[in-house]
Amino acid sequence: MSSQICRSASRAARSLLSSAKNARFFSEGRAIGAASVVHATGKVPQYASNFGKSGSGFVSNSWITGLLALPAAAFMLQDQEALAAEMERTFIAIKPDGVQRGLISEIITRFERKGYKLVGIKVMVPSKGFAQKHYHDLKERPFFNGLCNFLSSGPVVAMVWEGEGVIRYGRKLIGATDPQKSEPGTIRGDLAVVVGRNIIHGSDGPETAKDEISLWFKPEELVSYTSNAEKWIYGQN
């Protein structure tokens, strides 16, 4: 279940609970239990229809129906910090050719315009040994040595970006490894011509992202913060 659904369910559930805060049905947490069972089994349990009574009469059936309809009721008490923890992080590097061609701001702008958040950045010239660690999964390929020589040939802008779906969509923003096969609108499709000079690298999965971030950055070099734009990007209130 996406965190967007969780957020929507959380807001709706809190509204329902606030409107019915004096009802024993809600104060005893029975609504949460009933909704959780409905979400897990697809069936309304018998007890759910019997818990509408309170000391002052019957709780409005519309409130009960509305609450039981929430598919994410089990998550409705998650706060903003818990949701922030669901954000992915990915490693993105602008290679020496991208740096030398003055494309740093262009590439950063594309990620920012999408709504992703920069949480780590540095400029460095990696050694060949460091480049070999970065490309360790390609060490059996015939082009491995050339890749390492090129990555260590000049300055690299190493970055960590954060956001929902940033690993998968970051790859889409970058485009195919071969710029000739990259769609127009992607970074490589618009700004690169040949495979050997495709200007940018991006993690291809969660485990790769974790490994590459830990290789290029120390934990204290990454920051965690809430951007003022997040409520406009993700709909958080």
Curated annotation (Swiss-Prot):
GO cellular component, one term: mitochondrion
GO biological process, one term: GTP biosynthetic process
Keyword RNA-binding (UniProt): no
Lineage: superkingdom: Eukaryota
Record GO terms (molecular function): ATP binding; nucleoside diphosphate kinase activity; zinc ion binding
Span of chain positions assigned to the transit peptide in the UniProt entry: 1-84
HAMAP family, sorted: NDP_kinase
NCBIfam families: PRK00668.1
Task performed by this protein: Major role in the synthesis of nucleoside triphosphates other than ATP. The ATP gamma phosphate is transferred to the NDP beta phosphate via a ping-pong mechanism, using a phosphorylated active-site intermediate. Shows the highest specificity towards GDP.
Protein known as: Nucleoside diphosphate kinase IV, chloroplastic/mitochondrial
The species this protein was found in: Arabidopsis thaliana
